[in-house]
Amino acid sequence: MNQPPKPNSFRSGPDEEGRFGIFGGRFVAETLMPLILDLQDEWARAKNDPAFKAELENLGTHYIGRPSPLYFAERLTAELGGAKIYFKREELNHTGSHKINNCIGQILLAKRMGKTRIIAETGAGQHGVASATVAARFGLPCVVYMGATDVERQAPNVFRMKLLGAEVKPVTAGNGTLKDAMNEALRDWVTNVDSTYYLIGTAAGPHPYPEMVRDFQAVIGEEAKQQILEAEGRLPDLVVAAVGGGSNAIGIFHSFLDDEGVRIVGVEAGGKGLDGDEHCASLTAGSPGVLHGNRTYLLQDGDGQIKEGHSISAGLDYPGIGPEHAWLNDIGRVEYVPIMDHEALEAFQTLTRLEGIIPALEPSHALAEVIKRAPKMGKDEIILMNLSGRGDKDIFTVGKILGMGQ
């Protein structure tokens, strides 16, 4: 797992209460508090247990396919004419994204706690697929809550989950997206607290989830750091990742937070523009509040009602962000910027045609920012981007927009 942080480190959070500065914490129903505290105790034991680490590492190697490669995007670099661009190829993992890293870790915890049923929420369906996958691997029943809107736009992943034996429950409340799915999952958890483990897919939710998810995803940055040192003999100048709830981003960022020479940029979903409500840029255009068990930046109105965000990418369509990102934003260690739907779409097509890699729409947002920045950087500079998921799930969405048909 992680190397111990240095004193005065950006990597030492959260505190015992699960706070990163004023963000994080655990704001949950009384019925859930004993379970949350049990989970926290089990997590504290597990992360110091050599047998747990060994099992996690073994599954990482033989089931997920780690380490994922670091790939020099030669043609994209030449086309942009600036910094060298490297991708951390998380889309090559089993199930096609970074989500499996966290799911394997959490299902091992669920087994340790004696839980007999798994529930999960999903937006793009990648976390749902990864949850259904690990539930099948360990022989546990799995229920996945998914917004009705997302069920429609992510049909291939819905079919995958069902094939894997999971029950997919469409949620029609609100806009029928990730926030609404998470609300339903929390309701289920309160009702079935003794038997059920809630496998949260992003670095948000009540403590210890943000810390736990980050630590399971930190393998991305740990590997990438070693790989870039082997490839280039030095660290990158810039690390970039897309941010929805923020698990793939914190996974690659965490290892680099204490490296002063490394600039770090998180890319939010700018949707149709920040002047209206059709975006999901919580840090750029939101304000602090409490949602889903933690204090963080949210898209909310003057009365504290959560707004319904929008993104072309189902995985970024969440009106909040993990609390560690909120803190990193406020202290200025990480810069967060929005990318619009149309920019992500262009980046999606660029990568597909230049490198023969079809990216998911989520990392296409990060790629759009890389495409903007690379030409302004020197040819001796290095950009590292997390290519967090593959785009198979998005081909129909993109085809529809581009008028390609089936």
Swiss-Prot record:
EC number(s) recorded for this UniProt protein: 4.2.1.20
Q: Does the keyword Protein biosynthesis apply?
A: no
Q: Which UniProt keywords apply?
A: Amino-acid biosynthesis, Aromatic amino acid biosynthesis, Lyase, Pyridoxal phosphate, Tryptophan biosynthesis
Spans through the membrane: none
Please indicate if the UniProt record lists Hydrolase as a keyword. Answer: no
Which molecular-function annotations from GO does this UniProt entry contain? tryptophan synthase activity
N6-(pyridoxal phosphate)lysine-modified residues are where? Answer: K99
* Swiss-Prot/TrEMBL catalytic activity: (1S,2R)-1-C-(indol-3-yl)glycerol 3-phosphate + L-serine = D-glyceraldehyde 3-phosphate + L-tryptophan + H2O
Q: What is this protein called?
A: Tryptophan synthase beta chain
- Functional summary from the UniProt entry: The beta subunit is responsible for the synthesis of L-tryptophan from indole and L-serine.
Q: Which InterPro entries match?
A: Trp_synth_b_CS, Trp_synth_beta, Trp_synth_beta/beta-like, TrpB-like_PALP, TrpB-like_PALP_sf
**Known Gene3D superfamilies for this protein?**
3.40.50.1100
The entry assigns this protein to a family as follows: Belongs to the TrpB family.
Which species is the source of this protein?
Rhizobium meliloti (strain 1021) (Ensifer meliloti)
Q: Its pathway?
A: Amino-acid biosynthesis; L-tryptophan biosynthesis; L-tryptophan from chorismate: step 5/5
Q: How does it assemble?
A: Tetramer of two alpha and two beta chains.
State the superkingdom: Bacteria
Give a Gene Ontology cellular component term annotated to this protein. cytoplasm
Q: Which Pfam families match?
A: PALP (PF00291)
What cofactor is this protein dependent on?
A: pyridoxal 5'-phosphate
